Amino acid sequence: MPVVSLAELLESGVHFGHQTRRWNPRMAPYIYTSRNGVHIIDLVQTAQLVEQAYTYMKEASENGKHVLFVGTKRQAAGIIAQEAKRCGAFYINQRWLGGMLTNWETIKTRVERLKELEALEESGNLARRPKKEASMLRRELDKLQKYLGGIKNMRKIPDIVVIIDQRREHNAIQECQKLGIPIVSLLDTNCDPQTVDLPIPANDDAIRSIKLIVGKLADAIYAGRHGQPVDDNGDYGDFDEAIDEYADETDASESE
């Protein structure tokens, strides 16, 4: 069994890109065709690149490497948090703070402040503070949990960063490039593959697409830590036939 099948990718809408007028020509090698003014991503390549990313992240996890997931768009935020927690990775799903990685020593002081406030609350000492002071401290705690809760236990900059929506997370990409941190990224048809190390051509707007791909990457991290391998000798069949069959079904349902 492959890590991900063409059927799974099709059912999750991974193949739907953006309107053809919004494309980045550098994504041309990963585009299969266009239908009704929308680019269709070549899912054979997507499946193969998911395999590569899975193997890479599984081996990294086996060697004790740490992964940071970054996805601040509404469709990705909940998935990022859920999957990162499941596999023991870190995550940023609200807003990328400038210098999150390049100014890590400063960010780390805010993380320590978060831990300090959480300890204060858990001990009951926060509730015993004067009402006004307690209110201010709780507001500070809420804000720190919102933006830094996903990296609370991150002791150093990550070894790998996974990006959802390369265009939106351009600041994170720039910081990773500056520090030489490998980037694994979902790339829609309006993205630039030259800015990442391991591209995964995929619809980065649909919840099901994001959940499928991020879930597979989380599986890799989990397998690397817990020794649960996946048989990755995949047979992807005939994508031409699969996409034509899917398109025929879609056209038929739209004409009804």
UniProtKB/Swiss-Prot annotation:
One Gene Ontology term from the biological process aspect of the record: translation
GO molecular function, one term: structural constituent of ribosome
The keyword Cell inner membrane belongs to this UniProt entry's keyword annotation: no
Alphabetized Pfam families for the sequence: Ribosomal_S2
Amino acid composition bias (Acidic residues), ranges on this chain: 232-256
Keyword Ribonucleoprotein (UniProt): yes
UniProt keyword terms in alphabetical order: Ribonucleoprotein, Ribosomal protein
Entries under SUPFAM superfamilies matching the protein: Ribosomal protein S2
PANTHER family in the cross-refs: 30S RIBOSOMAL PROTEIN S2 PROKARYOTIC AND ORGANELLAR, SMALL RIBOSOMAL SUBUNIT PROTEIN US2M
Family: Belongs to the universal ribosomal protein uS2 family.
Name of the featured protein: Small ribosomal subunit protein uS2
Annotated gene: rpsB
